[in-house]
């Protein structure tokens, strides 16, 4: 059998096909090959056909392999088109039964690489279209229409060739015509795979050179070969026993750190779905694991490869006043593997910072290495600093690394290192008890989290104008949306926030932080102060004399200015109306909510005016229709925190009580602003 390879020289990644071809040629040997005979398919007798079971048995006996390996190799032979099925052409799998197969002619083997051009495929589709009278498969119809548009300029030639091949095929006998049709179909199934079928010949771009090509011997090539062998003779040779001993020692040293051989602590996140392993082994984790710190002592490359180890080593070098060595090494790594469009700028910066005479972080290297480096910087490239980087690397490895392992910094790091306990996988057969699977944390997300943490720390400033505010939480920080009285010791909620029908307060009521003092709301203080001015007596905030409720003050002030003929509005509606108007008339924008202090009440122009006396009151406004107003009077410690206020329903009772209720205006509002609100 004569086989000519016409296009394999530039496809070295397909070199394994030659081994398959050698095996296929042995299979076609008349004496030792696969048994072949004429087989009847439909109404045609096909010559040289064989069964899939015979092919599988021959591969097992010829190569001395298992049944599974032989099945896999047989599938490869069929998928690459060396054997094609007769009964099910689309199923390119070797069936170990009586299914019929046939050897492909060497002209259609993949190694021939005669170009499977669009013109040849168009001729094949046109011939099938003529033979099947327009009945093609869907993907063949799509390819036919696409090629008709693509090579429409020579479509007449395609139709003429298809008709000629169809007429020539009719002149052959029935068996040859059937065999040729099967061969063509098998070839195009491999080279123009249908949708959903794997294209086994998709190997990427063609290579320009062929590594298996026999090169012509020239004088230059012979000199290079002689030089190579001379250098090989000069190398120091090592016994195989010494090399194997080094490999065994390395394997024993790293066996405990091999996650596949020895497992990982606390557990493998891909098996147990526990992300604690990734959290404990983050790049710059605060406290590393003990196994990670112990690995730094294996060799210097393990230390400098780990970001956390490099950070600890940098801290040690700074104590020895030699931190510029590691800084120079990191700068060289950035030059080598960083953005190559900025090589020139980075090289100049490294020279000014580390190599120039009198540089701020000048490194100590020998004169010969310095001359080589400075000469190379005239035409900078990514490897221009390799000589200086190697010199500094060996200096740190032989001098600083040994002292680092004996330093208190490494010993303290090793003592503080954590050793996580092993966790077992929790499995459950119940679907609602299974844990949801999570993917591994993305490096992009981890980087974003680190940047957010740095930004959060940078933004955490201290307000020096408020002494003591940042040291502890405010002892009476509360959210007030209604009227409340001091709660009882047995309940964290105020009893006045409850109603007889509602034993528990709603979430929009008074909410107090646990274990803190009680802060009287500014509205209650104002109402108590106003009621005291009218003769009811000033109420104090204490447990012995809690004073009249706020609702009574509102009731009294409203009843005096209202005609007795009008019915009184409900208590809740009147309280909501007063609070709603209080919040809608710009009081929320007032500086009083920034910091309520008895020494600094707010005024209408938005500025803070200090008062000399605690009991000094603002001048009373005298509007025409105002019977009461809020006067902020707070008896609390000067270092107390702010009291927050919120409205339950700002719009409650707004439309129905406009005529029956008197306006309530804040003391920092003018009458015009109150009417405009």
UniProtKB/Swiss-Prot annotation:
Tissue localization of expression: Expressed in the central nervous system. Isoform RGS9L is found in striatum, hypothalamus and nucleus accumbens while isoform RGS9S is expressed in retina and pineal gland.
GO biological process annotation, one example: dark adaptation
Compartments (UniProt record): Membrane
Domain RGS span(s) in chain numbering: 295-416
Keywords assigned: Membrane, Sensory transduction, Signal transduction inhibitor, Vision
Ranges for domain G protein gamma: 219-280
Disordered: region residues: 530-571, 639-677
Membrane topology per record: Peripheral membrane protein
GO MF annotation list: GTPase activator activity
CDD domains: DEP_RGS7-like, GGL, RGS_RGS9
Record-annotated DEP domain positions: 30-105
One GO CC term on file: neuron projection
Keyword Membrane found: yes
Keyword hit for Membrane: yes
Family matches, as PROSITE patterns: DEP, RGS
Quaternary structure (record): Heterodimer with GNB5. Interacts with RGS7BP, leading to regulate the subcellular location of the heterodimer formed with GNB5. Component of the RGS9-1-Gbeta5 complex composed of RGS9 (RGS9-1), Gbeta5 (GNB5) and RGS9BP. Interacts with PDE6G and GNAT1.
PANTHER family: LP21163P, REGULATOR OF G-PROTEIN SIGNALING 9
Function, in words: Inhibits signal transduction by increasing the GTPase activity of G protein alpha subunits thereby driving them into their inactive GDP-bound form. Binds to GNAT1. Involved in phototransduction; key element in the recovery phase of visual transduction.
Name the record gives this protein: Regulator of G-protein signaling 9
Organism: Rattus norvegicus
């Amino acid at each position: 059998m004569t086989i000519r390879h016409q296009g394999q020289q530039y496809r070295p990644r397909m070199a394994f096909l030659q081994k398959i071809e050698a095996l296929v040629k042995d299979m076609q040997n008349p004496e030792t090959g696969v048994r072949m005979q004429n087989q009847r398919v439909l109404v045609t007798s096909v010559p040289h056909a064989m069964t899939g079971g015979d092919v599988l048995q021959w591969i097992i006996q010829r190569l001395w392999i298992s049944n599974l390996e032989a099945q896999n190799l047989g599938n490869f032979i069929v998928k690459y088109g060396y054997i094609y099925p007769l009964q099910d052409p689309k199923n390119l799998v070797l069936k170990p039964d009586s299914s019929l197969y046939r050897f492909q002619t060497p002209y259609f083997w993949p190694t021939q690489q005669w170009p499977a051009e669009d013109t040849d495929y168009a001729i094949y589709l046109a011939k099938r279209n003529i033979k099947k009278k327009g009945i093609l498969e869907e993907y063949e119809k799509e390819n036919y229409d696409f090629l008709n548009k693509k090579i429409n300029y020579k479509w007449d030639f395609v139709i003429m060739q298809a008709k000629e091949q169809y007429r020539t095929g009719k002149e052959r006998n029935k068996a040859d015509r059937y065999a040729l049709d099967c061969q063509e179909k098998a070839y195009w199934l491999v080279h123009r795979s249908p949708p959903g079928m794997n294209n086994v010949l998709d190997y990427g771009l063609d290579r320009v050179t062929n590594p298996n090509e026999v090169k012509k011997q020239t004088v230059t090539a012979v000199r290079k070969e002689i030089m190579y062998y001379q250098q090989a003779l000069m190398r120091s040779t090592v016994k195989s026993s010494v090399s194997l001993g080094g490999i065994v020692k390395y394997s024993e040293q790293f066996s405990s750190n091999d996650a596949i051989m020895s497992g990982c602590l606390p557990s493998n996140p891909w098996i147990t779905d526990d992300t604690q392993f990734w959290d404990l082994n983050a790049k710059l984790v605060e406290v590393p694991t003990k196994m990670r710190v112990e690995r730094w002592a294996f060799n210097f490359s393990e230390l400098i490869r780990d970001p956390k180890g490099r950070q600890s080593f940098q801290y040690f070098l700074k104590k020895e006043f030699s931190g510029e060595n590691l800084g120079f090494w990191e700068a060289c790594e950035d030059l080598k593997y960083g953005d190559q469009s900025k090589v020139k700028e980075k090289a100049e910066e490294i020279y000014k910072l580390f190599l120039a005479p009198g540089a701020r972080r000048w490194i100590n290297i020998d004169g010969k290495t310095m001359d080589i480096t400075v000469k190379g910087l005239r035409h900078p490239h990514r490897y221009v600093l390799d000589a200086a980087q190697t010199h500094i690397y060996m200096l740190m490895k032989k001098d600083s690394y040994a002292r680092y392992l004996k330093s208190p910094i490494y010993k303290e790091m090793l003592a503080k290192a954590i050793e996580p306990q092993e966790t077992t996988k929790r499995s459950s057969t119940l679907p609602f008890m299974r844990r949801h699977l999570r993917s591994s944390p993305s490096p992009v997300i981890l980087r974003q989290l680190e940047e957010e943490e740095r930004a959060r720390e940078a933004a955490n400033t201290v307000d020096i104008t408020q002494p003591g505010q940042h040291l502890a939480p405010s002892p009476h920080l509360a959210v007030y949306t209604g009227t409340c009285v001091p709660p009882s010791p047995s309940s964290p909620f105020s009893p006045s926030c409850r109603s007889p029908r509602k034993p528990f307060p709603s979430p929009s009521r008074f909410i107090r932080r646990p274990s803190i003092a009680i802060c009287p709301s500014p509205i209650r203080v104002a109402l108590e102060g106003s009621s005291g001015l009218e003769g009811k007596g000033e109420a104090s905030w204490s447990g012995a004399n809690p004073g009249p409720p706020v609702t009574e003050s509102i009731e009294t002030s409203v009843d005096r200015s209202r005609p007795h003929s009008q019915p009184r509005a409900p208590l809740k509606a009147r309280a909501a109306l007063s609070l709603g108007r209080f919040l809608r008339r710009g009081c929320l924008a007032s500086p009083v909510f920034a910091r309520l202090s008895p020494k600094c009440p707010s005024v209408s122009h938005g500025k803070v005016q200090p008062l000399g006396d605690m009991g000094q009151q603002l001048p009373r406004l005298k509007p025409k229709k105002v019977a009461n107003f809020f006067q902020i009077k707070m008896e609390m410690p000067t270092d107390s925190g702010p009291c927050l206020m919120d409205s339950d329903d700002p719009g409650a009772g707004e439309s129905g009580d406009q005529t029956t209720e008197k306006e309530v205006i804040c003391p920092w509002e003018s009458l015009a602003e109150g009417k405009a609100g």
